[in-house]
Amino acid sequence: MSSRYDRAVTIFSPDGRLLQVEYAQEAVRKGSTAVGVRGGNCVVLGVEKKSVAKLQEDRTVRKICVLDHVVMAFAGLTDARILINRAQVECQSHRLNVEDPVTLEYITRYIAQLKQKYTQSNGRRPFGISCLIGGFDADGSPYLFQTEPSGIFYEYKANATGCSAKTVREFFEKQYREEEVSTERGAVKLAIRALLEVAQSGQHNLEVAIMENGKPLKMLDRKVILEYLDIIEKEKEEELEKKKQKK
């Protein structure tokens, strides 16, 4: 009897749970770590890519994409392709009909509603991904949202999804400072430090994107990321030196 609750997305279990939705959330927890930081004048998204084969083109492994003037990172299954296509069409349709770009909350709500529909229909399964969505509204204000497989969404100053998301959230709660992320440099440093806390493949498979108001998405190349890594390493050494001096 219990298997019916496992298999059907439209049937609640006796304790009031939708098990298929919970399984989708478990798929997210097994995905690559993705982090987002809302800075004073930018939104930074970073992901840890899984190790690629030596002969595989690195550019084909992407966890960060652009939806019109909005940037999205995701963790979980390749279900993201469907959401990306639907969201891009919605962004273009809105721009043609209203002659204005979508707001961040509008496109986030659209993605969340699409996810929620898939938790109420037979013959479908929930989307096994969690999305971090960042960008700017027309007034120049930066925003960072996250959507879950169940269809809920929240706004954050900084957050993470994927495997080890809990560890990264705890890191953000301790390390996030408004004054430090007020600059692009500070926001990027915090995002990279968060990824390094849980990176399973070290520092070699990090992907970082910066969205600034009115500018195209900027993907940091390997050289720039290495420069940030050197700065972070030096700061760690300085902190250790200060602690030794206090003792």
From Swiss-Prot:
Keyword Nucleus attributed: yes
Tell me which InterPro entries the record gives: Ntn_hydrolases_N, Proteasome_alpha, Proteasome_alpha-type, Proteasome_asu_N, Proteasome_sua/b
Q: What is its main location?
A: cytoplasm
Gene3D superfamilies, sorted: Glutamine Phosphoribosylpyrophosphate, subunit 1, domain 1
Record's subcellular location: Cytoplasm; Nucleus
Task: Give Gene Ontology CC terms.
Answer: cytoplasm; nucleus; proteasome core complex, alpha-subunit complex
Record field: transmembrane: none
Q: Does the keyword Cytoplasm apply?
A: yes
Q: Name one GO biological process term.
A: ubiquitin-dependent protein catabolic process
* Domain of life of the organism encoding this protein: Eukaryota
Q: Which UniProt keywords apply?
A: Cytoplasm, Nucleus, Proteasome
Instruction: State whether it acts alone or in a complex, and with which partners, per the record.
Output: The 26S proteasome consists of a 20S proteasome core and two 19S regulatory subunits. The 20S proteasome core is composed of 28 subunits that are arranged in four stacked rings, resulting in a barrel-shaped structure. The two end rings are each formed by seven alpha subunits, and the two central rings are each formed by seven beta subunits. The catalytic chamber with the active sites is on the inside of the barrel.
Its biological purpose is as follows: The proteasome is a multicatalytic proteinase complex which is characterized by its ability to cleave peptides with Arg, Phe, Tyr, Leu, and Glu adjacent to the leaving group at neutral or slightly basic pH. The proteasome has an ATP-dependent proteolytic activity.
Protein family according to the UniProt entry: Belongs to the peptidase T1A family.
Q: What is this protein called?
A: Proteasome subunit alpha type-7-1
| Gene field | Pros28.1
